[in-house]
Amino acid sequence: MGGRVDHEYSYLFKMVLIGDSGVGKSNILSRFTRNHFSLDSKSTIGVEFATKSLQMEGKTIKAQIWDTAGQERYRAITSAYYRGAVGALLVYDITKRQSFDNVHRWLRELRDHADSSIVIMMVGNKSDLIHLRAVSEDEGKALAEKEGLFFLETSAMEAVNVEEAFQTIITEVYGIVNRKALAAKEAAAASAPLPSQGKTISIDSAAGNTKRACCSA
């Protein structure tokens, strides 16, 4: 999950936005990466992506976020779209019940095509349209808990919880990467062969010892 690529950043995390057309995926993306919102945002044609770099524990994390329209005619790009993704925002519109009902289908598609360890944040977007709400926050929380997903309601228009949604995924993925790196290091240390003629030397061995142990990096 993620990897070092060049000196400009320590890790590159690919993330995908999924959900029905019209739920506000493109505005969530533009709000996070450019702090921009457009009321006239049109449905995305094909695929586009944007990037944003964040600092975490002294390391630069570059998030590469892919966005595609939710219409059925773009199903052909599914495999390439999900390949290599370490995080996903599954977005529905709190004012459109159908978009919430379709979360199950999107989740199934995501799990069919993405890595099993992908971190998923379910997002109920357009929380500013409270007077038009068709899906309660409790319903969203309950479904997310049942499926083992993170959950937030957002407003791309009012910039509410958009940063938090991405930050949660990035923090979780970063933690997974670190745990895997530590596990790999411990496994390598455990399987390292012992020196053929060496002996165990404690750290408080006499300074006068002339025989030294050879250590592997």
From Swiss-Prot:
It is found in: Cell membrane. GTP binds at residues 19-26, 67-71, 125-128. The keyword Transferase does not apply. InterPro entries: P-loop_NTPase, Rab_GTPases_membrane_traffic, Small_GTP-bd, Small_GTPase. GO terms for cellular component: endosome; Golgi apparatus; plasma membrane. Pfam families: Ras (PF00071). Keywords: Cell membrane, GTP-binding, Lipoprotein, Membrane, Nucleotide-binding, Prenylation. A lipid is attached at residues 214-215 (S-geranylgeranyl cysteine). SUPFAM superfamilies: P-loop containing nucleoside triphosphate hydrolases. Belongs to the small GTPase superfamily. Rab family. This is Ras-related protein RGP2.
